[in-house]
Amino acid sequence: MKRISIFLIGLTCLTGTAFAQEIKEDFVPSVMNQPGQEYPMVNSQRYARFRIHAPEAQSVIVSLGLGGQGGTVLTKDANGVWTGTTAGPMDEGFHYYRMTIDGAVVNDPGTKNYYGSVRWESGIEIPAHDQDFYAMKDVPHGQVSQILYPSKETGQTHRAFVYLPPQYDGKKKFPVLYLQHGWGEDETAWSNQGHANLIMDNLIAEGKCKPFIIVMAYGMTNEVKWGGLASFDFTKFERVLVDDLVPYIDSHFKTIAKKEMRAMAGLSMGGMETKHITLARPETFGYYGIFSGGLYSPEEIGDPSKVKLVFLSCGSKEYPDAILKATETLKAAGYNAVSYISEGTAHEFQAWRRSLKEMAPLLFR
């Protein structure tokens, strides 16, 4: 657990460069901007430019990433407009950010908000070379709907989101993937930041993936203080998920209610939750997936016949060697283990979008 905590400390999204380069002035509005808003902007080199009108302010800084890492200092013109460009190119994909104006942390009014860092953060999308797999296309689309389910464990009603594939008609039964968000996020993360529904729609339309249901629940991770991952007890969420949510889903949707047709996966802390729950309740899930959230060992899982698939992934800027080594160890012990390394990404959503894209076709074969 200590090793995993170290992996998760550096949740930065801005990629620094060791050399300066001339910035191309081909900036265009980010696709995540509010309607009619020009800024923030991105260019073909993956630089981001921010602007805000704050005539009375004395300083404006943009901090990027989960928890607000680093800082791009904006400069003020004669009209009270602050503008600044990142020092270097950013990694492809989605990034959280926030503005600090005279010490007050605020969101950028030019862009949409996304839940992360235990607050609503601003979001920016850096165009990716492979963004076609989560693009909005003219294909049959599934539905993402909100559900409210009672929990005996907490005595409260909880919210989750459910993706139903285009083929869901209330008659045929489908397998289910329980897909968890990371620290500081909530049940909206995988559909809003991760585009899980679009990834699935496109894979299904291309015949690369079997249709299945995805359940995205709040993982209680916001009860964890920054830096407290190693001491967090996943047992409470284990009981909410397995004893409350799974039976609710099986009774309210057309599911194939057996272990061989259930999977669990998660990103970052959601991966840590996945590991805990799949090992604690091996009778519930047949497919395991950890995205940037740790490793499995043969000693932890036990009998290889208990699990259909073990999927491990991370960004190439994280701990790829550990992922590859763990996967080879599992294979040698008789497990169906698959690894995936997202090239050019760190601990960020582009790595996890790609991980879902790679894992989904392997499920429920």
Where are the language model's segments positioned?
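Sec/Tat signal peptide C-region and signal peptidase I cleavage site
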Residues: 16-20
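Bacterial N-terminal signal peptides
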Residues: 5-15
